[in-house]
Amino acid sequence: MKGPFPAVIQQYVSNPKLFDNTKRKFDLRIYVVVFDMEPLTAYIYNEGLVRCCSKDYQAPNVENCKIPHIHLTNSKINPSNSSSSSIEANTQNTNNKKATPAVEWENQVLVDIDDDTINGTLSSIELNKENSNNTTAVDEQSNKFLLTSWLEKPGNVESTSDFWKQVHDSVAATLLAIQPTCALMYNTCFPLSDRRENNVCRSFQTLGFDFIPDADNKLWLLEVNNNPSLNLDTRIDHKIKLPLLENIFNILSQT
């Protein structure tokens, strides 16, 4: 797109799935860690963030298209909206039940992306992880929620296996698309012969894949963030990001 600055035009998802018992649009942040580009070596973390808008969804029109709290799920935008706390109240009041208890970290794995993954078969590496502190699946200080807790609620997805297959297929296709260019740049900095001789990982990159689910449970890749925030702004951030970093360095210690 020509203009005063580079821009990308995306088709707006006109039938977004709305969060649980609320009328809020949301997205899903999935973390992917790339350790090598030749051969392509990457992992998907199977815990993530559900990030909600803080105003009820409305189909875009001339009047509301400039109201970010309706259409943009970015967590940096929505905490500034004073109505954000209502999501947490609506979530906990559904069927007069409390939020889903926090999951145990020993069940979390990083899933390896390899040729089998592209064909729909997943391989995983179990790593040692400590139990998290008593953190609920809902953070009342923000519009963030645990992905696994959302997946466990009936009706949110047709099946978790189908959900993760969509994620894996999208991540694999994205990484394969950028692999030739990234491999060239990577090999310029770290010659392949040197890497094989020393058998070490020279670098890694954490990516944030953001998906918008629609009303038919199809995942749409919104963007890939090459520098996702690892700030620990909320309790949910502590619960997700600290084990993620622990897993990354555990894998690095094995390479």
Language model region names:
Residues 1-206, 215-216, 234, 238-254:
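Catalytic core of tubulin tyrosine ligase-like
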Residues 225-233:
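Glycine-rich phosphate/pyrophosphate-binding beta-alpha loops
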Residues 211-213, 219-226:
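A short beta-strand motif that forms the metal-chelation/ATP-contact edge
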